[in-house]
Amino acid sequence: MALTKAEMAENLFEKLGVSKRDAKDLVEAFFEEVRRSLENGEQVKLSGFGNFDLRDKNQRPGRNPKTGEDIPITARRVVTFRPGQKLKSRVENATPKE
């Protein structure tokens, strides 16, 4: 099961006592700020969680799996995430819920 933005908003509503609308707006504003920073070429550092970085990938050779034809994979910019030590440690020591 995956955590969704709607579930995040519901959790904020329950834990902080803010209205459901405010909780939803808060979650949306947070992710919009992350998106905007990345669009502007900025790294996003979330202390105790991890870093979102931008990485430029060069063009490289590829192959069409259906035809076997060689095709170039175009250069592009990608977002990467590197978890922080605290997050790594918590995940490593967590007991998965089933």
Swiss-Prot record:
Keyword DNA-binding: yes
SMART domains: BHL
Subunit composition and interactions: Heterodimer of an alpha and a beta chain.
UniProt keyword Coiled coil present: no
PROSITE patterns: HISTONE_LIKE (PS00045)
InterPro entries: Hist_DNA-bd, Histone-like_DNA-bd_CS, IHF-like_DNA-bd_dom_sf, IHF_alpha
Organism of provenance: Proteus mirabilis (strain HI4320)
Official protein name in the record: Integration host factor subunit alpha
GO molecular function: DNA binding; structural constituent of chromatin
Domain of life: Bacteria
Function summary: This protein is one of the two subunits of integration host factor, a specific DNA-binding protein that functions in genetic recombination as well as in transcriptional and translational control.
GO cellular component: cytosol
